[in-house]
């Protein structure tokens, strides 16, 4: 990690804070502010972390915002991430060579594969410069949000292996410190680590070995969140990107971790013990609720004498995970295209927090082609977690040019082109009535369809008209120049939103899309309105299609809507 910090410094991407800063909220708050600066943001190195409540000073500095912008991401990759995506695309399209030059190029490609698999070192070869810590309390573990249940490791590389040791997995899971030598393992039900857990448990075993690494090459933690197919070790991707194998050293529990890790925590998950984990302010921008999760017993902690503790803060976008997700989006496009050949491009808007909204451009060749691809998306790996997807044709503007793209989509909007489905969803999703399972919606905006022309009113007149039927606070129309403006409505909910929508259908000649939100939202901030809407809706419950009009209930839910979980 020290080597990468030097690289950040040389590229003017590092800000060093010498003053003592508290691990309880303060470090995370400063990192949050810095991350909001976008491409102007820098990584932050806190040289003197402290805990005021415990009257404690830590010896290990804290690095935040490692992936502060696209330049930092490329520095971690050692090259442009777009170059990696192009290389994957060419690899997938390899064909039998005919000319001598093509044969040589093919041979050189094959030779480069020898550096992909990790290299295992002899036992403890790299541990000579490590010291043994007595407990987790010696690490500057952060509390990032006021209502978090405690301190969490937020950039831990969690290494596991299956029962017969034929598969290895690297995942990035938050880890709540529940005692001085105990962590709570937030394994989501769909993740490989959780699958290994059930292998051990079904075999009647009591323990499952787990090791956690922190720091080292920053590409390790990026690889940990890469959506690779089940059974593929994430560090193979490291070898492909860097063209050099990861060097792994064994822990005493049999798990291998990178030799240059700054901190290594090894132990085991007790297969019979669970404790309440959370709440935690997560990347969705909401607190995830307290739930039972497995307990990891820490047996040994190693740390370099000059170790750097790497951490991150997640919450309302945009934050550091935006940059990490950008690399993922670009690099996995060629792989996704193998399952969806007519996919031209896709984009995960940051305010859609990855799994809540995806935009896709396709080469639409026949009726219902977009619907066919919707089903493909919802059945491919981690794409299956996506709640909402909008598809446009190959002539659409760039998927990142929202000012041009959104009117283009609205000119092609038709309620008959909306597909409502259901399936698995991210365990962090709070809107669905059931954990891990809920509604999905796809919109086919590939073809311009003739629809009746609306009589568009000014916002004030439309609000006055609507108030004759429903008690509203305010409204704002977006993209009034398009065929289907979006009308966002603020209200203090007095009845089910569907009832309010039904009443407003009397004025349907003035609108095609109504979105209902709670009073605390700001109509001037369209970025956060999108974030709120895609977070707060379950498509099967909250989307109403009547008389060729669309209603969306993005308000908080409760018993009236059949929602029995705790709304965050």
Q: What is each of the regions a protein language model found here?
A:
Residues 1-280, 284-295, 299-568:
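Extended, highly charged
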């Amino acid at each position: 990690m020290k080597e990468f910090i030097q690289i950040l410094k040389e590229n003017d991407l590092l800000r060093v804070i010498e003053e003592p800063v508290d691990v309880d909220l303060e470090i995370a708050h400063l990192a949050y502010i810095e991350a909001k600066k976008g491409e102007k943001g820098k990584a932050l190195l806190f040289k003197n972390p402290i805990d005021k409540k415990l009257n404690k000073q830590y010896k290990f500095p804290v690095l935040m915002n490692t992936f502060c912008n696209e330049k930092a991401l490329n520095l971690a990759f050692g090259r442009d991430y777009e170059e990696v995506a192009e290389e994957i695309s060419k690899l997938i399209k390899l064909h039998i060579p005919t000319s001598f030059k093509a044969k040589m190029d093919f041979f050189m490609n094959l030779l480069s594969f020898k550096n992909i698999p990790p290299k295992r070192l002899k036992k403890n070869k790299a541990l000579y410069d490590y010291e043994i810590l007595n407990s987790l309390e010696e690490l500057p573990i952060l509390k990032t949000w006021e209502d978090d249940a405690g301190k969490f490791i937020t950039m831990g590389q969690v290494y596991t292996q299956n029962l017969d040791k034929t598969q290895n997995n690297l995942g990035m899971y938050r880890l709540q410190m529940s005692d001085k030598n105990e962590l709570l393992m937030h394994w989501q039900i769909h993740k490989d680590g959780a699958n290994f857990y059930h292998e051990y448990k079904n075999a009647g075993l009591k323990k499952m070995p787990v090791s956690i690494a922190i720091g080292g090459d920053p590409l390790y933690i990026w690889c940990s969140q890469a959506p690779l197919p089940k059974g593929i070790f994430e560090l193979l991707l490291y070898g492909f990107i860097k063209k050099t194998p990861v060097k792994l050293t064994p822990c005493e529990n049999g798990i291998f971790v990178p030799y240059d890790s700054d901190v290594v925590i090894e132990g085991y998950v007790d297969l019979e013990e669970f404790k309440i984990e959370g709440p935690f302010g997560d990347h969705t921008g909401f607190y995830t609720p307290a739930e039972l999760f497995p307990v990891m017993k820490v047996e040994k902690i190693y740390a370099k004498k000059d170790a750097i503790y790497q951490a991150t803060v997640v919450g309302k976008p945009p934050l550091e995970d935006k940059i990490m997700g950008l690399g993922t989006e670009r690099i996995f496009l060629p792989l996704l295209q193998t399952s969806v050949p007519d996919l031209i491009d896709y984009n995960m808007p940051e305010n859609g927090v990855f799994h809540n909204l995806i935009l896709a451009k396709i080469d639409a060749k026949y009726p219902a082609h977009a619907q066919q691809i919707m089903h493909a998306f919802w059945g491919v790996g981690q794409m299956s977690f996506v709640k909402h997807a909008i598809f446009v044709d190959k002539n659409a503007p760039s998927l990142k040019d929202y000012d041009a793209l959104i009117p283009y989509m609205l000119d092609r909007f038709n309620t008959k082109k909306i597909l409502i489905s259901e399936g698995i969803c991210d365990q962090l999703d709070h809107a669905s009535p059931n954990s891990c399972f809920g509604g999905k919606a796809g919109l086919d905006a590939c073809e311009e369809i003739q629809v009746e022309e609306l009589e568009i009113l000014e916002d004030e007149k439309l609000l006055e008209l609507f108030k004759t039927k429903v008690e509203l606070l305010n409204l704002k129309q977006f993209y009034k120049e398009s065929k289907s403006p979006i009308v966002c409505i603020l209200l203090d909910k007095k009845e089910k939103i569907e009832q309010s929508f039904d009443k407003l259908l009397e004025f349907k000649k003035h609108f095609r899309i109504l979105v209902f939100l709670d009073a605390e939202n700001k109509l001037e901030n369209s970025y956060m309105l999108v974030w709120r809407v895609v977070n707060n809706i379950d498509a099967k419950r909250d989307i109403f299609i009547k008389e060729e009009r669309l209603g969306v209930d993005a308000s908080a839910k409760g018993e009236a809507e059949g929602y029995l979980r705790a709304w965050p």
